[in-house]
Structures are given as structure tokens and as C-alpha cells.
Amino acid sequence: MHVVRLSIHRLRRFQTVELHPSSALNLLTGDNGAGKTSVLEALHLMAYGRSFRGRVRDGLIQQGANDLEVFVEWKEGGGAAVERTRRAGLRHSGQEWTGRLDGEDVAQLGSLCAALAVVTFEPGSHVLISGGGEPRRRFLDWGLFHVEPDFLTLWRRYARALKQRNALLKQGAQPRMLDAWDNELAESGETLTSRRMRYLERLQDRLVPVADAIAPALGLSALTFAPGWKRHEVSLADALLLARERDRQNGYTSQGPHRADWMPSFHALPGKDALSRGQAKLTALACLLAQAEDFAFERGEWPVIALDDLGSELDRHHQGRVLQRLASAPAQVLITATETPPGLADAAALLQQFHVEHGQIARQATVN
């Protein structure tokens, strides 16, 4: 899939601006604070329902405005499938939102998020590796959400059961009142965990060659999954029963896939905690690119790939390796930088360049 039009209204520095990117490599340059990242934020907002830099109400809406609007038009399919044009719009006030997809109102943000797939690498992406388990769970679930049509229903089923069980625990409910929600949590949780495990195994097969291509010095060798309870010893139903009294005392559910995690392993490093910030960024980028490749294999088309501030996040050597990997794939890529990154200098003829300044985006002539 590739975006053919991105229209942004009242978002940070932009009053009204439109971008018509190419279907391949795109570079947006401009001074710090010019609004380059805001372009990717708008795209990310449509694909995830949130910005990668915080909540909508935390500064994303232009000062003095009541809401923001983002409109995206993109092509999907092609090849063996019939290409079609899709359109989505989102208006967000920070508290309330309205959305449309292909001319119809949508009742849930998930409908918009399921339609447009964007893989984003930005300065905070290192937390995928160096942070807590929540971003790693979201990473797994994003991949499943986009390649398994019924995954969102399963995830919501588990989340609802977890919410109800936790509410009863906080109320100090009697054990018999927990039985029904324990059964629901165990049934949906076992299925959710099996899906995550299969996905991570498949992703590992894609990740190792990607990491070897863009950062061979990392020596990334495997991904290890922790399901959130001692699954090799007991079922989730038994784990919930065994932990019931402790959970009642603490007021929350301590066992289950909401506590799951996964970790990368390396040939020459003891684990992710031994990584430098730069190594964590490279590992995160390798994971994201592997996820994009898996999406492409399963769906028959690539997601849009957004790389924010590439020049300051990766050195020239790694920029070149990443670009080489992306150039071999029919993916639309949007890159931001204050100036053309050294790793992209030799690929100027392949780039569609844009300059962002004073709240406007100007298309620049392609270098031949």
C-alpha cells in the first residue's frame, strides 16, 4: 500500500497542508521545529489512533484550535490483487473524535487502524527493546491485528474479562464470583498466547536475516517469549486459581498474557540490558523492518514505512545498510531529516524530496 495524498489541518504548526508522496522513497527536510515530524505524526495518528509523541490533547492540536483533522488517500492491492483506492478521515478534539472510512462513518478507531498499516521508527523506538513489556506486547499485537482478521475480537474478549476480574478483585469479591471470569480469561488467554507464540516464531525467522543485513555486529540470534505465567508447568486456568488469594489481596490479576514479554538474544551479548542506546535503536529498527516484511508476505503488499530523524538516529554506515534493504523492497518510505543524510546522498536520484518550512511543504525537483 502507498499513500497518494495526506491532508493535515490544525496539527501543531500546520494550519492546512497537503503532501503527495511518491510510491517509493520520500525525504522531508527542514530545520528543527519546522514540522517534518508532524507529517509523520499525522500519518501515525490515522494508523494507530494516537501520536508517537503523546496524546492528542498534549499539544498535537494547533494552539487556539478546537480540533485537528487528518485525511489520507492511499492505494492498496495491485500485483495479483486488484488495486483499489481507499480514503479515511479523522477529526479529533483530544476528548472526542469522528472518523470516516471509504465514505462511511466509523464507530471504532480500530476500523481506521485496521485499514491503513504504517510501521514507524522514531527517536523513542528504542523503548521497544530497552523499555518495559507493554511496548513489546503492543508490537506483537499490532502484527497479529493486521494479518489475522479475528485477532482484535479475541484481544477485546481477553481485555474485557481482565477488566471485569480486576474490578471484582478490587471490591474484595468472594471467590465464587470470580469463577465465570476466570474461565473466560483462561479460555481467551490461552488462545491469545498461542497466537503470539506462533507469530513470534515466524517473526524470528524474518528478523535474524534482517538484523544481519542492517547491523551484523549485533549478532542477533533469537527471540524468547515469556507468556505471563509458568505455562510449561500449569494451564492459565490453574495459574489463576493458584494466584486467586494473592490477587484478591493485591487487587489485580498477576497471571496471564497481559504480563507477557519477549526478549532478543545475541551471540556475543548477555541480553538486551547490555545494549547501548545505539544498539537498542538498531535492534528495534531490525524488529520493525522484520515486522514490515512479515506483513508484506502475509498480506501480499507492504505497509507504509516512516523513519523519523534518520540522520541523527543512525550513522552513515547503518543508514546505507537500511536504505539498501528498503530499496530492494517495493515499499513506500517516508524519511525526515534536517538535511539529506549521508547514507542517502548516493541515492538522490531515487528520492522524491520535500522541504518543510513556515508551516508549508514544498516539493523539490528530483535529481537526475
Swiss-Prot record:
**One GO term of the biological process aspect:** double-strand break repair
The record's subcellular location field reads: Cytoplasm
Superkingdom of this protein's organism? Bacteria
**Coiled coil ranges:** none
Check the record and name the Gene3D superfamilies matching this protein.
P-loop containing nucleotide triphosphate hydrolases, RecF/RecN/SMC, N-terminal domain
Q: What exactly does this protein do?
A: The RecF protein is involved in DNA metabolism; it is required for DNA replication and normal SOS inducibility. RecF binds preferentially to single-stranded, linear DNA. It also seems to bind ATP.
Q: What is this protein called?
A: DNA replication and repair protein RecF
Whose protein is this, by species?
Answer: Xanthomonas axonopodis pv. citri (strain 306)
